[in-house]
Amino acid sequence: MKYASNNIRNILIAGHAGSGKTTLTEALVYFSGAAERMGRVEDGTTISDFDPEEAKRKASLSASVVPVEYEGIKYNLIDAPGLFDFEAGEYEGIRAAESVLVCVSGRSGVTVGAEKAFQLARKNGKATMVFVSKCDLENANYFKILEDMKIKFGSTVCPCVVPAKLDDGTPVYINLFSQKAFKYEGGKQVQVDLPDIGHRFQGLIEAMSEAIAETDDELMEKFFGGEAFTTEEIVEGMRKGVKDGLITPVFCGSAVNQQALDMLLYNMHKLLPSPEHNSVLAEDANGEPVELTCAESEPTAAYVFKTVADPFVGKLSYLRVVSGKITAGASLVNARTGETEKMGKPLTVMGKKQTEAESIGAGDIGAVAKLVSAKTGDTLCDASRVVKLPAPVFPKPSLFMAVTVAKKGDEGKISSALARLMEEDPTLSYVNNAETHQQIIGGLGEQHLDVVKAKLKNKFGVEIGLEAPRIAYRESIRKACQKQGRHKKQTGGHGQFGDVVINFEPCDSEQVVFEEKVFGGSVPKNFFPAVEKGVRLAAEKGVLAGYPVVGLKATLLDGSYHPVDSSEMAFIMAAKLAYKAAMPEAGPVILEPIHTLKAHVPNDNTGDIMGDVTKRRGRVLGMEPDEDGLQTIIAEVPLAELANFTTFIRQTTQGRGWFTTEFARYEILPEMLVPAVVKQARKLGNLDESADD
């Protein structure tokens, strides 16, 4: 069935892992009558968690789209992962939604995942609603959670449905709008007498009324006049407050036992915005801002918010249609590449189930298979109006591991399989490090990379191992040294002869610098390039650990030649001999890469993080606040010391903190650490016999 944009609600369901997001999604599908039975996370039978890895780990690993149709309204629910290693799902989903439903566990309370989801919603200007789940459990403490929410989410928090219990312990839910109470029998609502919750009831009504009054001058006047609001005024004031970010309504219930879901669905319809009047800002072909209206009569503009790579079916692109509509055979321009994409048959998606549709209308969500150039973050638009919607900024990888191949010859397969996985996961990176000869993958944490490893095996038939990446050290010298290199070899016929005197000294360049100051014809000019080539070839391996040499200046001063036996190869060999003679006496050192670290952490954790940076041989350069209310610690730390920093910062900040690193420069490795690096170099075969003396 096709829905007008005013009858669509696009809602991201977000929160901490284990707070009940997937169970709530499943419960709403079952409540709407779209499923004959309700799946369970524990059994791996939910609609949302259809990936084999999700079923195995009993947790959401990516965002999934689950539409719920109920009483003429289509709710496109986007169930996002709560595990921090997979937070890309929240960043994808929030771009397709007008609203965010933050799920909070009635047992665990307001955990970090809920805080981060609320902040992400606010940062992106989304309407926000809270659902406190598991309220029928014995140890649920709704009112304590409510107070915590007011502290962590701010004064916009406004309870709309609160739990209570009858004398026999039966859970009931009080609707503060209607001031009526309901219990649930088999998911069906049964009105009961309003239970006595003491002074709380009047306080809740007054707090809600005051929040509503602040949305409108007339309502404010009525409030101060002591008049009660009508149900219509309550709903309209609440709706306006939600849209303007002045009110965060809080609902509650039990997803597992189908309690108070009717009130949640009704109010998601009444209080949360539809796409109809939610105009979106984009850029036109000249980079000028343009407002897109959600109407099918407008030129088409659709946003690719998620990509799924399937080795058998191919690529599936999830689209949020901002204006116009998607139809089979339509040609749309990819605003990023300028290429034209021909649309396949539009699909409606329910978890893994795909159903062909005539079109995907303005404001709705659907999918198209086998697009060629489109990737997550792209805008597909009509050629008559090329526009680009802002692409999301995803968290950057912070944990990097080297790939080891279980089966020889699979290197090529790994590259192509990882390229496919990167299409569906913007927080995954992959590079071939030419210097260390390793394939390096980067992700958001150990769980993330473990899932990547499992997907490579199960989806693409490629088995890999993961190990710490090698560090790309360098070598240099600290003082000047002048040495002769004489290469003489006599055989039958022509011999080989080359003789050079070269001065080696430190310099500021990151490369090897070559000069010549030869007087007279002791070394003919036509052999200068051979001498330079010999120096550069030799400098590819330092004498301590076989790493490339930088910051080296070599000056050719003198030498000699033989009119018959001298050759280009002879002078290359002579230059190498001079290098090998000079370097051990020139104060050789190993250089290690230093990275600039920017750690974003809560103020309470700054001391722990700075202390840890110091233990890692780092230098703290300063601290400044960031735009999200965290403190940014700026430091310089050796790359070799950052191996487990991802785990440390997450544990220390309970998942609130994050960091980025960027190469800064090379510095001399402390002498006490040199033996270990040399030992590792020997193990890797960096040192040949001539460099191993």
What do these predicted ranges mean?
Residues 1-693:
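Structural and coupling elements of P-loop NTPases
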